[in-house]
Amino acid sequence: DNGNELTYWGNVMEPIIRKEFMNRTGLKVRQKHAMIFHEEYPYLFADVDGIVTDERGEKCIFEAKTASQYKADQWENGVPEEYVLQVQHYLAVCGMNKAYIAALIGGNKFVFTIIYRDDSLIEELIVKEKEFWEECVLTDTEPVVDDSEATQEYLLSLIHI
């Protein structure tokens, strides 16, 4: 399964990406080995790759990513949208204001950046996540099929040619 292979290599590379981030920034990343749950919405949780204490002593999220060379263009103008949304979700769950995201692209290009908390985006995410939890998970109802790229990719993955 391609997803499992991608996940496997992401897990293998995570400590290497974390170490390179620490080498380049001088910041210490502490691994986090526990799920973190939102205080108000216990069905919202985060599994962060690490916690960074920045130069001002503020605790921040650390996320490590790997990307194939085929997806390098998605990193040209910043962080791809799906990772921005993931990090904003994590910031909401953890109650933090900042995250560092580091990526190894194509196996030979290292990038990192800061993502700051966006409360208006977080509000939108929580509304959607609450809606999904109440309307789909609690009622055991499959979500409505839409015309999003993610849905199209999923449906195509079901076809074995």
Language model segments and positions:
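Charged, glycine-rich intrinsically disordered N-terminal tails and low-complexity linkers that flank
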Residues: D1-V12
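Nucleic-acid nuclease catalytic cores
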Residues: T7, N23-V48, V52-V137
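Residue-level preference for nonpolar/small residues embedded in alpha-helices
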Residues: M13-E14, E82
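Residue patterns forming the tRNA-binding/recognition surfaces of aminoacyl-tRNA synthetases
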Residues: L138-Q152
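Conserved small/polar residues in nucleotide/adenosyl-binding loops
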Residues: I159-I161
